[in-house]
Amino acid sequence: MNGSPKLDRIDINILSTLQAQGNITNVNLAEAVGLSPSPCLQRVKRLEKAGYIQNYRAMINLKKLAEHVTVFTEVTLADHRRKDFVKFENEIKKHENVVECHLLSGGYDYLLKFVARGVSQYQEIMEELLDRNLGIDKYFSYIAIKPIVEKHAVPIHDLVNRD
């Protein structure tokens, strides 16, 4: 948050409302946070410019769209120099089936989340990644059976509450 404007209660309420209802109209957002539309829009624009709001997007119901499989993959790199991490990260960002990638501390280096048409497509993806010599030493795959919790909103009020 260095260099970013300090958030007040109304800013936090705007962020919280927008992450739950990204397509809310400015008039309805203003009403929800207790402002008139013009100052509300000014605040939203300020929050966008400051980088607090990165994007607006639709959540697609994949079950309705197509059969698919979600796979979580633990990846350990063979070498642990900065250039090895940079190479892996730059290449993995390019792969459309990788929907999340996290650098971790602990027993392995990365946790990736893949979405693919099926297990066979996932295996083809992994073989292709291994063939590209990205420095992968080993990987372990975990097929998701069903989602139990899938939150796409974070507890903003809890994270910024300093009391």
Regions found by a protein language model. Give the residues of each.
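A compositional/biophysical signature of low hydrophobicity enriched in polar/charged and small residues
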Residues: M1-D163
